[in-house]
């Protein structure tokens, strides 16, 4: 059993595995995964590349706390689709399934989970009440301040996370052009917008900024979002 749990811990991170699965093996596993050789190079103990360790030591007084924080798993942020639910309703539904959730710190639509469940299999996801999106990306959409009935262009839409957020903020009114040069990434937007119940988004693959589809819209947009490179990275 311990070998199997160790494999899971190495693959997903021990903090992402529920205590109900780890049981009494949690502490032994943590000890196994914790560097023990104090004679090992400092960057090995910190589990970071040497170049990063050297820079951090110079730039940060409390670099040990930084390295410890880097070893922690990031929480999972959801954006609540306010066309179908409220953050309070989503938190209540998650709580009923035994998942601890809380509101985000900055985005009104953000709900943060302490674990990373198989969310895509849950009704709350399939029904389009939530979508996975980190709080920072949610704020990008809010900074655009889209209004109902406006013409908006998401110039580097990618898989459409911020496009969907814009669509919800506009209450599925107006028109959003979702452009990207990567056809494969943009293809993921269509099923997501259907699940979200949005009808104001129009995805299109373009060659570059001089594409005819873009030229036709010159001077017609109320707002344009250009998030390049993607803030999510």
Predicted regions and their residues:
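S-adenosylmethionine
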Residues: 1-233
